[in-house]
Design a protein with these regions (language model features):
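Helix-loop-beta segment of a Rossmann-like dinucleotide-binding subdomain
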Residues: 78-89, 103, 109, 114-161, ...
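Helical element adjacent to the flavin cofactor pocket in flavoenzyme catalytic cores
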Residues: 137-193
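Beta1/beta-strand and adjacent pyrophosphate-binding region of the FAD-binding site
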Residues: 1-14, 29
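Glycine-rich FAD pyrophosphate-binding loop
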Residues: 23-42
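Dinucleotide-binding Rossmann-like beta1-alpha1 core, especially the glycine-rich loop
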Residues: 46-124, 247-249, 285
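C-terminal lid/capping helical subdomain adjacent to the catalytic/cofactor pocket in oxidative enzymes
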Residues: 2, 320-376
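Short hydrophobic core segments
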Residues: 7-9, 190-202, 342
């Protein structure tokens, strides 16, 4: 039976980044149930780096991740991980209260977010329906993220530090014996004193195999469409446009347009597929807000974003099951928080001191703990 210091379950951004960090401290094996890494949520993300997204914990983790994503270590990637892409939040006349709430949270998170006039927003976007925008604010330093580069960079770190990856390795049993977890995949069994549960939408199911209590993790489906703009309409310089109540967003994507109804439909863990109702909803909302007419879709897909009750990620040792570390509930924020989250997970798994830069953003181990009162 092959032995390791750490076994990480799940090959999305959470598992790969945590495994790369853990490989600084010991021998790491990453297990992925699918044929390739990042098949589910990570590989379907419309990732964007913004300080105006998520609750206070998410915003702190995002801020702590910014320096890494802006200037990664030498050799991490062959190109920049992010590129400038401003974001404009818009509101109709009947959304004034929601806009005020959004603006207050936004300006508390970033001093660079400012309110702009409807005319300025319309000029920046270029395709808003006349009279639609009553208020707007601008995040000038938001960024587009290259998900593939970020994920492959962590994978490269993992293997360079001696870590190994095994795909088509769905965990079927977890048994602790003589201080070691025996992790059986059906064809092989591996052992390690510490297991990190980064199984995404399946994290509660993996926990059940270990005898741990579930977190009450709820996967939620998010739908995305791609469509071509009308002939003669150039949206390459268009910002990310998002409704102040997250009823829709759209942005340019490699010469076409990516849009979403920002849906959060409860789902079991699965290979998520888009529903026609959600596709119709995003088409209707974007057409109502803009001069765009969506005649044909270039592509459509869906992914799962998994949350616990307080919508804050869960990182740390299970309070009852020795050697079982949670790394789950990232919601839709896993990529932009991955540098900070991976260091938090590795710190807690190894018992090292909490990172000072993460603490400086108001995030402490107890805030992410699976034993925190808000999960009771």
């Amino acid at each position: 039976m092959a032995s390791w210091d750490f076994i990480v379950i799940g090959g999305g951004i959470a598992g790969v980044s945590a495994a790369a960090e853990l490989a600084r401290s010991g021998r790491v094996l990453l297990l992925e149930r699918e044929e390739r890494l990042a098949y589910h949520t990570t590989g379907r993300s419309a990732a964007f780096f913004t300080m105006n997204y998520g609750n206070a914990m998410i915003r702190g983790l995002t801020a702590a991740s910014g320096p890494f994503l802006t200037k990664p270590p030498d050799g991490f990637a062959e190109a920049p991980l992010m590129s400038p892409h401003p974001a404009v939040t818009v509101a109709r006349h009947d959304q004034d209260t929601a806009f005020e709430t959004n603006l207050a949270k936004a300006t508390a998170s970033s001093g660079n977010i400012v309110e702009i006039s409807p005319g300025e927003a319309e000029a920046m976007i270029g395709v808003m329906a006349p009279g639609y925008v009553a208020r707007a604010h601008l995040e000038p330093d938001a960024m587009a993220m290259d998900v593939d580069l970020i994920h492959s960079g962590f994978r490269r770190q993992l293997t360079a530090r001696g870590g190994e990856i095994t795909c088509r390795a769905e965990v079927q049993s977890l048994r602790r014996k003589n201080g070691l977890w025996q992790v059986a995949t059906g064809t092989q069994t591996f052992q390690a004193p510490v297991v990190v549960n980064a199984a995404g939408a399946w994290a509660d199911e993996v926990a059940g195999l270990a005898g741990a209590r579930p977190l009450g993790l709820q996967p939620k489906r998010r739908t995305v469409i791609l469509f071509a703009p009308p002939e003669g309409v150039d949206l390459r310089r268009c910002p990310l446009v998002i409704d102040c109540e997250e009823l829709f967003y759209f942005k340019p994507e490699a010469g076409i347009v990516l849009g979403s109804p920002a849906d959060e439909t409860d789902s079991p863990p699965c290979d998520a597929q888009p529903e026609e109702f959600d596709i119709a909803r995003v088409v209707e909302r974007i057409e109502a807000a803009t001069t765009l007419q969506i005649r044909r879709l270039a592509h459509k897909w869906a992914g799962l974003r998994s949350f616990v009750a307080d919508r804050t990620p869960v990182v740390g040792h299970d309070p009852e099951i020795k050697g079982f570390v949670w790394l789950a509930g990232q919601g839709g924020y896993g990529i932009m928080t991955s540098p900070a989250m991976s260091r938090a997970a590795a710190t807690l798994a190894t018992g090292n001191a909490w990172p000072l830069d993460i603490a400086a953003h108001g995030i402490h181990a107890e805030d992410l703990s699976p034993a925190r009162p808000s999960l009771a």
